Amino acid sequence: MKTSLRFAALMLLVLPGAVMANEKLVQDRQCMGCHALKEDGAAPSFQKIAKFWKGKGNAEVAMVATIRKGSAATGGPHWNKATMPDQSERPLVSEAEARQIAKWILKQ
């Protein structure tokens, strides 16, 4: 019982930090220049993206590809006329960072 309580307490401390770290990564990689959490701007909101991908088995893989290569290269979904630029037009995002970002978006 003590171990379970300690683990639960540890998770309460660690998980919010992980969520904040992913949000910071999204900000550091300038994703918020086009996207916002709840409202559409130049690009769809993260909540709209999460809703679109909800329940799709290939969501994370497809999102990672789009985050890394841009939507034109991957044939990814397009909202309105906005397309995700490739990494020549924005900060470099590693494979691991793209996975973190995709997982964070899917939790929105």
Question: What are the language-model segments listed below?
Answer:
Residues G33, P44-K51, K69-E97:
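Axial heme c-ligation environment in periplasmic c-type cytochrome domains
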Residues E23-L25:
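Immediate flanking context of iron-sulfur cluster ligation sites
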Residues Q27, A36-R68:
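Gly/Gly-Pro-rich "capping" loops immediately C-terminal to redox-active cysteine motifs
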Residues P16-A21:
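N-terminal signal peptide c-region/cleavage motif recognized by signal peptidases
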Residues V64, E95-A102:
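Short, amphipathic alpha-helical "lid/cap" segments that border enzyme active or binding sites
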Residues Q30-L37, I101:
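The canonical Cys-X-X-Cys-His
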Residues M1-A9:
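Bacterial N-terminal signal peptides that target proteins for export
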Residues R90-V93, A102-Q108:
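Short, exposed beta-strand-loop hairpins at the edges of beta-sheets
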